[in-house]
Design a protein with these regions (language model features):
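Flexible, solvent-exposed loop segments that connect beta-strands
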Residues: 82-97, 128-148
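Gram-negative outer-membrane beta-barrel proteins
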Residues: 42-46, 61-65, 84-90, 112, ...
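Short loop/turn motifs that connect adjacent beta-strands in outer-membrane beta-barrel proteins
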Residues: 18-31, 62-74, 111-118, 162-166
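Residues on the lipid-exposed face of transmembrane beta-strands in outer-membrane beta-barrel proteins
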Residues: 36-40, 53-59, 80-82, 102-108, ...
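Short glycine/proline- and aromatic-enriched beta-strand/turn motifs that initiate or cap beta-hairpins
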Residues: 16-63, 85, 173-175, 180-184
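C-terminal segment of classical bacterial N-terminal signal peptides
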Residues: 6-15
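Predominantly the C-terminal beta-signal and adjacent terminal strand-loop region
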Residues: 19-22, 27-30, 140-184
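Residues that define the transmembrane beta-barrel architecture of outer-membrane proteins
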Residues: 30-32, 47-53, 72, 96-102, ...
Length: 184
């Protein structure tokens, strides 16, 4: 009896994989995801990457996603980012700019484990740039990014769910990389 008890305690049990991805709908049931975040902006407009803050909001539109046999969902994601840039590419003297970015994307979420989810998103972002007035004596320089426009946006990301309603969120894409916290 003692030997049997020792064997039961000492012999490792077979680990069971997290079956979250194979359980459709086994993800947070939410009406909105709120994600405040820090932003690193793309460096293709200025000589260095930008930095700032922002927020995203996700509204689920398909609870069980496009693949009914796995745990996935689809949401519309939109938000606002304020990004500051230094060192304009078109001048050798110091200059800077601030950008307001308004992303709108379709986000496809995959809940791969109880504490981890990944996603891909694609859409557009509207932007408005404000270059410092001292850069061009109050005028918009030729080739200056101080304007309004629309460009494509795409990203992949992951969330570490450290509770049922809060997750650390990393998004890597164009035009920004963000690190924030998601609340459901």
């Amino acid at each position: 009896v003692v030997a049997a008890a020792v064997c039961l305690v000492c012999i490792p049990r077979t680990a069971h994989a997290d079956e979250t991805i194979r359980s459709p709908g086994a993800h947070p049931d939410y009406s909105v995801e709120i994600e405040p975040h820090f932003v690193i902006g793309d460096d293709s407009v200025f000589a260095s990457a930008g930095y700032g803050v922002g927020a995203r909001f996700g509204i689920p539109i398909v609870r069980n996603g496009f693949v009914p046999s796995i745990n996935n969902s689809v949401a519309i994601n939109f938000g606002i980012d304020l990004v500051h840039y230094d060192q304009c590419y078109y001048l050798t003297t110091g200059c800077g700019a601030n950008y307001l970015l308004f992303p709108v994307a379709l986000q496809w979420n995959f809940f791969v484990a109880r504490q981890f989810s990944v996603y891909a998103e694609g859409g557009i972002f509207l932007y408005k740039g404000f270059v410092s007035d001292t850069v061009c004596a109050g005028n918009v320089c030729a080739g200056s990014p101080s304007d309004f426009g629309v460009l494509p946006a795409f990203a992949v990301g992951g969330r570490w769910h450290f509770s049922d309603h809060v997750a650390l969120n990393l998004r890597v894409g164009y035009p920004t990389v963000t690190l924030g916290v998601s609340f459901w």
